[in-house]
From Swiss-Prot:
The protein's name: Aspartyl/glutamyl-tRNA(Asn/Gln) amidotransferase subunit C
GO molecular function, one term: asparaginyl-tRNA synthase (glutamine-hydrolyzing) activity
Endpoints of the signal sequence: none
Domain of life the protein comes from: Bacteria
Gene this protein is translated from: gatC
PANTHER family: GLUTAMYL-TRNA(GLN) AMIDOTRANSFERASE SUBUNIT C, MITOCHONDRIAL (PTHR15004:SF0)
Catalytic reaction annotation: L-glutamyl-tRNA(Gln) + L-glutamine + ATP + H2O = L-glutaminyl-tRNA(Gln) + L-glutamate + ADP + phosphate + H(+); L-aspartyl-tRNA(Asn) + L-glutamine + ATP + H2O = L-asparaginyl-tRNA(Asn) + L-glutamate + ADP + phosphate + 2 H(+)
Family note: Belongs to the GatC family.
HAMAP family xref list: GatC
Native organism: Janthinobacterium sp. (strain Marseille) (Minibacterium massiliensis)
Amino acid sequence: MSLELSDVKRLSTLAQIELTTEQSAQTLDKLNGIFALVEQLRAVDTTGIEPLNHPIATMLPDLALRLREDVVSEANRRDDYQKVAPATQDGLYLVPKVIE
């Protein structure tokens, strides 16, 4: 896949970014370079290769990841906070409508 200058101009318009002709050409080269790398990655046969959890896992198979237990460290004080809120409903805070 490769882009053309018209694609870059359309993308810059959609993103509301003003680019000069020179900047558009540079951006085109960079984007086409990225797409070329993606195509190279797609060409690699990864059949039978397990995904990695950690990039060093292949070099150090006994590596133990330092993960802590997922435990609650604070009390649930939602009811206390909602008592002083101006308006709540079903555990949610009600706010005035700001967009018509």
